[in-house]
Amino acid sequence: MEGETSWISHCPDYVAPDMVEFDSFSELNDEDNGEASLVPVDLILPDDLLERILAYLPIASIFRAGCVCKRWYEIVKSTRFLWNFSQVLSQKPWYFMFTSSEEPVGYAYDPSLRKWYGVELPCIQTSNWFIASSCGLVCFMDNDSRSELYVCNPITKCYKSLDEPPGLKFSDYSALAISVNKKTCCYSVTIIKSKQVPGNFFQWDLAIHIYDSGKMMWVTPLTEVLTGWRGGDESVICDGVLYFLIYSTGGGGPDNRHGLITYNLSSRSSHGLLIRSFIPVPCSLTCGRLMNLKEKLVMVGGIGKPDRPDIIKGIGIWELNGKEWQEIARMPHKYFQGFGEFDDVFASSGTDDLIYIQSYGAPALLVFDVKQKQWRWSQKCPVTKRFPLQLFTGFCFEPRLEMAP
């Protein structure tokens, strides 16, 4: 299909070198009557210098480089090369778009090269699983029993299965988050479970479960009953603090349907009410999506109409400073219209300086560069909508080679 590139075709483990074409290095030699003579790179550069050069290539180009020859293949697979790669500035985050509701298949978008790659995700079975990512690792949790948990690197396909979290086996709502410590390469996974108190719609049991990869164990530092609010499926970890959205169960006005709760993962206090950390959302929202941009909490939200708060009229982006929201951007109307019919809920995720926004009803993908304040459509995804009720969703992740669960 036009515009599609198979990610597997770039992986030296799966493809023979003669399947990929490369340009040769050449220079003009006056002594040979102006004819070009090939100059093998192997004779010019020592291993350590070649490793540093290759480490600055985009991810896809690194896999292509591994197909050039045996020497280059061994270099890109070496531990020293992975260390060099880890010292290079992070690659721009990619966006994986699911193209089926039944199977975990789709394409990953590279904003640097503006290309889509066919990527096969390990572990995950359907696109409706819970997904969270941090620093090259992605965490999956099944949506049925919520007992299957995996942490993987979607680029290298390395993965690890986590033990089932403690507490309630079944919950009405769950929120998943992961945070990787770049210095130690250890990670924390949090699951917030929310379940209605039997016979009381206004009261909801809420529990926070934390997995520490260093200790390889779960702890449940907090359980609490919320009145008038319930947990949902939005959470993220920024600079050691767990943020999650809560939703009104009735009694509040139309401007008070969402709220934000914070929980410090370092202190892990089990005392005091969570509701004391309540932070109101900046305006009436149809939905909110939380993300970590350089350890700052950013929320992308659908802005509701004043007279019909459940009807979306636009999309805003806010950053949390202390307990105050600061609007950093609002989607221009031409891009909002460019999605066509836009539902009151939508997919959005981001990291570093990029935010991706996607309508569930179409494969169109909009990218916002926070640093440059620039909106831009992605290259067209190599998939078309086959039937009216077909849904599209996805998630953002950092493409990294050196991270392993």
Spans of features found by a protein language model:
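Short, conserved recognition motifs on repeat-domain binding surfaces
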Residues: 1-405
